From Swiss-Prot:
Family label: Belongs to the universal ribosomal protein uL4 family.
The protein's name: Large ribosomal subunit protein uL4
Keywords carried by this UniProt record: Repressor, Ribonucleoprotein, Ribosomal protein, RNA-binding, rRNA-binding, Transcription, Transcription regulation, Transcription termination, Translation regulation
A Gene Ontology molecular function term of the record: rRNA binding
Organism expressing this protein natively: Vibrio cholerae serotype O1 (strain ATCC 39315 / El Tor Inaba N16961)
Main function: One of the primary rRNA binding proteins, this protein initially binds near the 5'-end of the 23S rRNA. It is important during the early stages of 50S assembly. It makes multiple contacts with different domains of the 23S rRNA in the assembled 50S subunit and ribosome.
NCBIfam families: rplD_bact
Keyword hit for Repressor: yes
Length: 200
């Protein structure tokens, strides 16, 4: 199949990468797993046995008229432990390479179908100036966009750093979440070829 390249000849690409059916269940599973893996999972609270103190019985069992109590660190007491204390946990989910590649191909194919993937011969700015990048994006009628280049372009990265809803990444930096987070994805022809090789 062929992808239209703005201001250049069409680019021949693999149909298995850019023309496959959209597998919603697979994409959902991989995106959820990716987001889960980003969680810190470091929260921690103390149970009644971990809170310091509370060794002595606050008052005798009988004869005071008060409710019986065995420790001042009971969860129903102020400064007591937490009943079901949260503990650090690993939220990461296993995603096979085949599943990851399949999800990436599904997303890229859907971007092509929805005409949300724009391919250009090359994309750069001469100086790290946000104004220059805004002008370039205005020419292409883009404002909510992920820019994917073949290799890291520092000028482009610095120019986009202060723009809301604009992100610049090289091919190795893209993932399922970033591809679906933006309205449009702008890729250079070199990046398209690299993505194709990466997912082959």
């Amino acid at each position: 199949m062929e992808l239209m390249v703005k201001g250049a000849n069409a680019l021949t690409v693999s149909e298995t990468t850019f023309g496959r059916e959209f597998n919603e269940a697979l994409v959902h599973q991989v995106v959820v797993a990716y987001a889960a893996g980003a969680r810190q999972g470091t929260r921690a609270q103390k149970t009644r046995s971990e809170v310091s103190g509370g060794g002595a019985k606050p008052w005798r069992q009988k004869g005071t008229g008060r409710a019986r109590a065995g420790t001042i660190r009971s969860p129903i007491w102020r400064t007591g432990g937490v009943t079901f204390a949260a503990k650090p946990q690993d939220h990461s989910q296993k995603v096979n390479k085949k599943m990851y590649r399949g999800a990436m191909k599904s997303i890229l194919s859907e971007l092509v179908r929805q005409e949300r993937l724009i391919v250009v011969e090359n994309f750069s700015v001469e100086a790290p100036k946000t104004k220059a990048l805004v002008a370039k994006l205005k020419e292409l009628e883009l404002n909510d966009v992920l820019i994917v280049t073949g290799e890291v372009d520092e000028n482009l990265f610095l120019a986009a750093r202060n723009l809301y809803k604009v992100d610049v990444r090289d091919v190795t930096g893209i993932d399922p979440v970033s591809l679906i987070a933006f309205d449009k994805v702008l890729m250079t022809a070199a990046a398209v070829k690299q993505v194709e090789e990466m997912l082959a």
